[in-house]
């Protein structure tokens, strides 16, 4: 994938589970607005925060100034990072890495391509970057408290060939 704008949720999940490098191997350029960076690194004691900061410092993730939020700022159910990431994706005409259900719905309504953390894992497995998806999803649910429905997990595992 060429250029992708990321929201904090899947970025934190991938970094916290030790898979930020997998994401960076899949995308040619990962861009985040300043607010998303702040959300990811507000508590440097949390897993993944230092990995995200280090990737930005090393230039592996490009941090840009927050764009004008535009139409996305008026959508009540979006947090600031989601609204700004959606705005940036519109400006640079790229897909967005986002897991929030409302954020994904808004992106699709505005013809923004969407990929989520699970989609990144499926691509990673297909490209041979990881051998199994299930333990990563389990670590997101158990270790991070990441909200993944049982039906979504089952669907992803079926696509990954890890469950029938």
What are the language-model segments listed below?
Residues 100-105, 109-117, 126, 130:
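Mid-chain, well-packed structural core segment of small domains
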């Amino acid at each position: 994938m060429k250029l992708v704008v990321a929201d904090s949720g899947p970025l934190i999940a991938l970094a916290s589970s030790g898979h930020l490098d997998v994401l960076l191997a899949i995308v040619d350029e990962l861009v985040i607005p300043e607010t998303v960076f702040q959300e990811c690194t507000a508590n440097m004691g949390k897993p993944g925060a230092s990995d995200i900061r280090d990737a930005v410092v090393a230039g592996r993730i490009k941090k840009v100034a927050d764009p004008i939020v535009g139409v996305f700022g008026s959508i009540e159910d979006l947090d600031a990072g989601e609204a700004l990431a959606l705005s940036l994706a519109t400006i640079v005409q790229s897909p967005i890495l986002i897991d929030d259900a409302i954020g994904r719905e808004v992106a699709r309504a505005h013809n923004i391509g969407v990929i989520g953390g699970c989609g990144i894992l499926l691509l990673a497995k297909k490209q041979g970057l990881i051998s199994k998806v299930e333990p990563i999803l389990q670590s997101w649910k158990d270790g991070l408290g990441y909200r993944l429905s049982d039906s979504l997990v089952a669907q992803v595992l079926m696509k990954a060939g890890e469950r029938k």
